[in-house]
């Protein structure tokens, strides 16, 4: 099954997450099919906190990719 989920990057105590499309059997930070955005929870005041390529996100959900709970929460937060 193909899922859209967060892959952690960054450093200790400085998390940075890539929003990726991957096979559900792959590791959290392992191989992925496509990167569709990022989420920076510790972004500075003037910098971008979340970016999503909505066209690619719509494509992948259209072909049956499941969205993880964390990514669904980010989508809802960005829409508001």
Swiss-Prot record:
Keywords, in A-Z order: Ribonucleoprotein, Ribosomal protein
Chain's gene name: rpsP
HAMAP family xrefs: Ribosomal_bS16
GO molecular function: structural constituent of ribosome
PROSITE patterns from the UniProt entry: RIBOSOMAL_S16 (PS00732)
Similarity comment: family membership: Belongs to the bacterial ribosomal protein bS16 family.
GO cellular component, one term: cytoplasm
Protein name in UniProt: Small ribosomal subunit protein bS16
GO BP, sorted A to Z: translation
Record's keyword annotation contains Ribonucleoprotein: yes
Pfam family, one: Ribosomal_S16
């Amino acid at each position: 099954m193909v899922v859209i989920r967060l892959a952690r990057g960054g450093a200790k105590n400085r998390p940075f997450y890539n929003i990726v499309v991957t096979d559900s059997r792959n590791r959290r930070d392992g191989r992925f099919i496509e990167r569709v955005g990022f989420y920076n929870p510790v972004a500075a005041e003037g910098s971008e906190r979340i970016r999503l390529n909505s066209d690619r996100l719509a494509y992948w959900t259209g072909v049956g990719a499941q969205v993880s709970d964390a990514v669904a929460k980010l989508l809802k937060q960005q829409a508001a």
